Each structure stands twice: as structure tokens, then as C-alpha cells.
Regions:
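Aromatic-lined substrate-binding rim segments of carbohydrate-active enzymes
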Residues: 57-126, 170-197, 211
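Substrate-binding cleft of secreted/luminal carbohydrate-active enzymes
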Residues: 156, 257-335
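N-terminal Sec-pathway targeting helices
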Residues: 1-20
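Surface-exposed, active-site-proximal loop segments in enzymatic domains
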Residues: 76-91, 114-135, 164-172, 230, ...
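Glycoside hydrolase catalytic-domain groove-lining segments
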Residues: 189-273, 324-328
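Active-site groove signature of glycoside hydrolases
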Residues: 113-115, 138-173, 306
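Short, acidic/polar
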Residues: 49-65, 138-148, 199-209, 286-296
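Boundary/entry segment of secreted carbohydrate-active catalytic domains
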Residues: 22-69, 74
Length: 335
């Protein structure tokens, strides 16, 4: 019995050693020099309005003051088609034209699930449609949007849906993978530019999203608030977590590019951040945390990052006389 017990312990030790060695090896990957990193932002006119800002004024400042030349823009379906077959392209046309005049590169996000709360942005007229009809209308909106903009040379990729495999987050229907595949296939049939599929960095496994992507985009957050736990959370992970995850997923999926599509650069609290005190906002984002986040992201082994929070930086600047993050961003995008 004694010898048998020793053999079991030895096998346990060997197994653990192999697992730990594999994790250690998978945690290695290329880390890019700071001068080779590329930064962009996600812009939401909806979020700017929510903060009481003029979206057009802000957008021009993003282009001309911050010198941002990589953008993720959002084709909100409920704004583009507020009534069935009644389209309003004015806002998105303007954004794309302004970006084009500065030769900025654009990822255009399309779908029912898109950036910013409540995550899904279906027009109200689709609420009472049967699912089959709603799907048909969704495909029609994607088709019309891509056909409208596919001759624009500044659009470099189409993002189809936003974090589709995180359907439990936000006010959204359950994911239908087969329909997601139809959306992606439609986009591919209309234009040859790459397809971006995104997923949560901390809450998803990536494989299903990465398999569908030419460009896979992860989110990256460190400090958030959980309504379920009713407390603030600091994710106890290191940059190596993303290196390991990427290397493991790369065994099963082979996107051509891996990017950080949503890098936390704004607070995440129990309420909208404009309704939080400065001290409360600082718990999850401020200038020092932004600098830490940028260092963390670089060490995670990615080269391209789209920051999430440009509306917040400007709101802090004009509403609270706090221009620290805005000025930090100037230096970031100027490099």
C-alpha cells in the first residue's frame, strides 16, 4: 500500500509538473516595442449625446486635436432605420466623410448587437416581428449598409455584431449561432474586406468567435462593477493570462490578426459614470489607471488597440475641468 501510494503521488506530481510547464510555455509570446504599437478609438455619437456633448464637435476634436487615425464607428440600426424602409444616413455619412477627409481608417460595426448599453439596438418596429422576419430584416439592413459604404476606401473591415457570444450581457436575445453565420456569410458575399468578430477578454473562451474571424478582437478590462455581486471587481490576472489564452485558442482557430477592440479607458460603476462622484469614478478609471492599463495591454502581446472611453475623457475635460486623460491621449496618438 505504501509503495502504491508513492506511485500515485509521483504521477500526480508529474501531471502537475507537465500542466504547469505547458502553461508556462504558453505564456510566452511577442511583446511589441512601444514605438510599434498602434492605437485607435471607438466613437459613439449616442454616448456623446448621453453625456450632453455635441457629437460633431467632439468627433472633429478627436480627429484634429487627438490626431486619431484609426476608428471603430457604429452603424446603429435603430438610428439608421427608425421606421421600416425609412432610412436616415446623415449622422453616419458625416462621420465617415469627416474621417475620410483625414484619411483615417475605419472598422464599421454592423448588426443588432453593437457597442454601448443596452448592447442591442434593434429598431422598435422589429419588436413584434416573428423571429424569421426579424432575421430577414436584420440581413437586409446589413446588406444595405455594406452596399452603401463598400466603395469607401477608408473602411478597412466590417465588424459583424459585438461580442455575440456574450449574449447574457445586456438586454439582448439569446445568440443563434446559425444566424450569426448567415450574417457573416452575407458580409463576405458583398465585399472582400476582412470580417471582425469580437469577444470578451475575461468572460469568454474566444474559440467560437476566433474561428469565424479574419480579425479577432478581444475586450480588455481590469476594474469593473458587478451588479450580481454588488461590488467592485479587480480582475486578478496578469498580461500572461491573455498570452496563454491566445496561444491555446490559436491551436483551434486561425484568424489573420488579433487585436484589442475594446481597451478599458473609462469608469465602470453601479450607475452611469456621469452620475458617480469623482471618487467613485476614480475607483475604476483615472489618469494613473489609464497609464497602467496601457502598460498592461502592451505586455499582453497585442500590437493594435482601440480605446474605449474617448467620450469620457472629453466629458471630464469640459464638465469637470479635468483634462488629464485627454492630454495623455494626445501624446499617445501623436507617437
Amino acid at each position: 500500500m505504501y509503495i502504491r501510494g508513492l506511485k500515485i503521488l509521483l504521477w500526480v506530481f508529474i501531471t502537475l509538473a507537465v500542466i504547469l510547464s505547458a502553461v508556462w510555455l504558453l505564456s510566452f509570446g511577442k511583446i511589441y516595442d512601444k514605438q510599434n504599437l498602434e492605437y485607435g478609438i471607438t466613437f459613439s455619437s449616442r454616448q456623446a449625446k448621453n453625456l450632453g456633448l455635441d457629437p460633431k464637435v467632439l468627433f472633429v476634436k478627436i480627429l484634429d486635436e487627438l490626431k486619431v487615425d484609426k476608428l471603430r464607428l457604429v452603424a446603429y440600426w435603430d438610428e439608421i432605420e427608425p421606421e421600416n424602409n425609412n432610412y436616415n444616413w446623415n449622422d453616419l455619412d458625416w462621420q465617415i466623410n469627416e474621417a475620410g477627409e483625414r484619411d483615417a481608417k475605419i472598422i464599421l460595426a454592423i448588426g443588432g448587437r453593437l457597442p454601448r448599453w443596452p448592447e442591442c439596438h434593434y429598431p422598435t418596429w422589429t419588436n413584434n416581428l416573428k423571429q424569421e422576419q426579424k432575421n430577414s430584416e436584420t440581413l437586409e439592413y446589413i446588406k444595405i449598409t455594406i452596399e452603401r459604404y463598400k466603395n469607401n476606401k477608408n473602411i478597412i473591415a466590417w465588424q459583424i455584431e459585438n461580442e455575440p457570444f456574450l449574449s447574457h450581457f445586456g438586454e439582448c436575445p439569446e445568440l443563434n449561432k446559425k444566424f450569426l453565420d448567415k450574417e457573416i456569410a452575407l458580409a463576405r458575399s458583398l465585399d472582400s474586406r476582412p470580417i471582425v468578430v469580437t469577444d470578451s477578454g475575461e468572460l469568454s473562451l474566444w474559440v467560437l468567435a476566433a474561428r469565424r474571424a479574419d480579425i479577432f478582437g478581444t475586450t480588455m478590462y481590469r476594474d469593473t462593477y458587478s451588479k450580481v455581486l454588488q461590488r467592485y471587481i479587480h480582475y486578478p490576472i496578469t498580461p500572461a493570462f491573455f498570452q496563454v489564452k491566445k496561444n491555446v485558442v490559436n491551436l483551434f482557430a486561425h484568424p489573420k490578426e488579433w487585436i484589442v477592440i475594446e481597451l478599458q479607458a473609462e469608469p465602470w460603476g453601479p450607475k452611469q459614470y456621469q452620475d458617480l462622484s469623482q471618487a467613485e469614478r476614480d475607483r475604476t478609471m483615472n489618469l494613473e489607471k489609464l497609464k497602467e492599463m496601457l502598460d498592461f495591454a502592451r505586455l499582453a502581446g497585442f500590437q493594435e488597440f482601440y480605446l474605449w472611453g474617448v467620450e469620457y475623457w472629453y466629458w471630464e475635460k469640459v464638465s469637470n475641468n479635468n483634462d488629464g486623460m485627454w492630454e495623455e491621449a494626445k501624446g499617445l496618438f501623436a507617437n
